[in-house]
Regions:
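Signature of the chorismate-utilizing enzyme
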Residues: 1-219
Length: 219
């Protein structure tokens, strides 16, 4: 699962001025911001139609450990090889799926959304190498392509730690901010205790195997 973003003008971005000491403090800050945004007396509107993103900077956090705590059926996680970039997300603020009309079309839609959104907004997902190949049962719901922006995201880039939430400008008038508020209210922020002897995988099966994967990439 790969993240995708691109530079843009941050019309829709709001960030806390200083770093929070705990995830709980960051959670409370974001919840307050979302409630203020959802207040009928608040007439603030973004300057474009892109994603609205609220961010809270943190001193430290562990995205994967945080993700294991969350009671949410929609979860994503990605990190680079050096582990200097880690992203964990829950819920779905926006999803673009299928791609039967062609991968170029779906990528154009994603590019337009990112252009109108803060540069820290990212889609997570991917697409099949061969859209015409048969699909195994466990991947049928995925379709040919699927990209998601999570509702709530915890990320580390180099040493910058951020808890953020994403939503669309129309979510306010369509009463779609309540699910985000519910998610923030139920967000678990306590520390995770990692066992000294984690489970060890006994078997590994790669499909496709490495050589076949290389051939697919080169096609």
């Amino acid at each position: 699962m790969l993240p995708a973003n691109q530079p843009s003008t941050d019309y829709n971005l709001k960030v806390n001025p200083e770093k929070f000491q705990s995830l709980e403090d960051a959670r409370c800050f974001l919840l307050k911001q979302v409630k203020e945004w959802d207040n009928p007396q608040n007439k603030t509107t973004p300057e474009n139609s892109g994603v609205v993103r609220l961010e809270a900077s943190l001193e430290s956090a562990h995205p994967l450990e945080w993700l294991t705590l969350q009671d949410c059926s929609q979860k994503i996680y990605w990190e680079n090889r050096s582990q200097k970039e880690q992203f964990a997300g829950i819920g779905t603020a926006l999803e673009i799926a299928d791609g039967k009309d062609g991968y170029e079309n779906i990528l154009q839609v994603i590019s337009k959304i990112l252009k109108d959104s803060p540069e820290t907004v990212r889609f997570y997902g991917g697409m099949r190498f061969d859209s015409k190949a048969s699909i195994s049962p466990e991947w049928e719901t995925w379709g040919t392509a699927r990209f998601t922006i999570p509702l709530v995201e915890l990320s580390i880039i180099e040493e910058n730690v951020t808890l953020a939430c994403n939503f669309l400008p129309d979510d306010k008038k369509n009463s779609k901010l309540q699910p985000l508020q519910n998610l923030l209210e139920s967000l678990r922020t306590e520390d995770v205790i990692i066992p000294d002897n984690p489970l060890i995988g006994l078997e590994r099966h790669d499909l496709p195997e490495y050589r076949q994967w290389c051939r697919l990439v080169e096609q």
